[in-house]
Curated annotation (Swiss-Prot):
Function per UniProt: Catalyzes the ATP-dependent conversion of 7-carboxy-7-deazaguanine (CDG) to 7-cyano-7-deazaguanine (preQ(0)).
Top-level division of the source organism's lineage: Bacteria
Entry protein name: 7-cyano-7-deazaguanine synthase
Disulfide bonds: none
EC number: 6.3.4.20
Record note on cofactor: Binds 1 zinc ion per subunit.
GO molecular function: ATP binding; ligase activity, forming carbon-nitrogen bonds; zinc ion binding
BP-aspect Gene Ontology terms: queuosine biosynthetic process
Residues the entry annotates as binding Zn(2+): 193, 201, 204, 207
Species per Swiss-Prot/TrEMBL record: Mannheimia succiniciproducens (strain KCTC 0769BP / MBEL55E)
Keyword field contains Chloroplast: no
Catalytic activity: 7-carboxy-7-deazaguanine + NH4(+) + ATP = 7-cyano-7-deazaguanine + ADP + phosphate + H2O + H(+)
């Protein structure tokens, strides 16, 4: 991987799930900041499948990144959705999928900011995306910008929330991984499947989005 490190000695923390998007963000952060200046925060929020946490742990260790696991599973007691409960994936009348976890990204950003301030870190990186965001309201740029202001005011600290994938399609996210020299790494080691199937089930919305994006990118290279 080409380490450009344009940020000098600045440090960054990546919200990291072990999925395609957050792993691509982690790899980009390593290129931009240097591996010694990057940390990862992973959340146990009551997700149905342990494979997600296992992948995140393995990748962090493989890349030499300090990983901090934060337990926010209390959210499971106050909300229900297909990410935490054994229910069929559906959409409501407005088109919102029941894989949406109310408050999840707000909670992740809050806890990451608390951790970051304690470590003297100002740059927070998250892989949310408004282009292929499945209708999740907390993946929108307007939410991230609002949360950035709120966190700065709440803690009297200058956080900078970076969203390198915000306006990329899934195909462009694969392209970014390729430009980082990590296309095969992301293909082989990340987990995206909502059903927790190793290598992907191929039929859930997340697997379909991932595979369609990959095929679009590979076709564009020919």
């Amino acid at each position: 991987m080409n380490i450009t490190n344009p940020n000098g000695d600045r440090k960054a923390v990546v919200i990291f799930s072990g999925g395609q998007d957050s792993t691509t963000c982690l790899l980009k952060a390593i290129a931009d900041y240097g591996v010694e200046n990057v940390e990862a925060v992973t959340f146990q929020y009551g997700q149905r499948h342990a494979i997600e946490l296992e992948k995140a742990k393995w990748i962090a260790q493989d890349l030499g990144i300090k990983q901090t696991l934060i337990d926010t599973s209390v959210i499971k007691t106050i909300t229900a959705n297909a990410m935490m409960d054994n229910i069929k994936i559906t959409k409501d009348e407005a088109g919102m999928p029941n894989t949406f976890v109310d408050g999840r990204n707000a909670l992740f950003l809050l806890y990451t900011a608390i951790y970051a301030k304690g470590q003297g870190i100002r740059d927070i990186i998250t892989g949310v995306c408004e282009t292929d965001f499945s209708g999740y309201p907390d993946c929108r740029d307007v939410f991230i910008k609002s949360m950035n202001v709120t966190l700065n005011l709440a803690m009297d600290y200058q956080f900078n929330i970076h969203t390198p994938l915000m306006y990329l399609t899934k195909a462009q996210t694969w392209q970014l991984a390729d430009e980082l020299g990590a296309l095969n790494y992301v293909r082989e080691h990340t987990h995206t499947c909502y059903l927790g199937v190793e290598g992907g089930c191929g039929s859930c919305p997340s697997c379909i989005l991932r595979e369609n994006g990959l095929q679009q990118y590979l076709a564009s290279k020919q």
